[in-house]
Amino acid sequence: GGEEHVLSVTELAIDTGYTKAELEQIVTQGDTVSFAMPLLPMENDRVCGRSLDDRSGIAAILYALSLVQGEELPCSCSVLFSTQEETGERGATIGAFTIEPDIALAVDVTFALGHGDDPVKCGKMGGGPMIGISPTLSRDVTNALIAAADAEQIPWQPEVMSGMTGTNADRFSVTKGGVRTGTVSIPLRYMHTPAEVIQISDVKQTGELLAAYLRRCSVC
């Protein structure tokens, strides 16, 4: 018991209102279940919904692509929308092995500051994307992201990590002979719940940062 107790799968049950016989005609073992939570607009340029980790990252990438559409970039850009990031980064492992990139950017979410949270460990909603700084990341790529943000006057925040990033970047960086990797993350509240909250301006500025980096496609 207690607030910190995490229920195991064997402790969970879903009351469907059906009898066992009726339910067996509808579902089978292994069927997935999710919360029927719509995307809800909020005040102050924010939205609430499920799976914004990492739908917001996909939105930022698509926005970045729209910004550079039709432009002649100084590099070849591949986009990977991978699965199972939360269960071992399996999609990222296969994708990076197949693409064999020279440089990889992982776009994800990170913890946004809320009531009672440590401001040292969290980003500020509305403060722009967070650029990862970690010993597992390429400092050259990190510096190039910072330079792109500063050149285009895009607000950004540092996300300092002492080890692994907890993102697909951890897989990218050790693919084959190693890949120079960076992270760009969107501040998000209530992570891994059906009511995650993001600020739209952070998503747009993440896309703007990615586009600015693509126009340079270089490391410092």
Write out the residue ranges for each language-model feature.
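N-terminal hydrophobic/helix-forming segments and targeting peptides
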Residues: 1-220
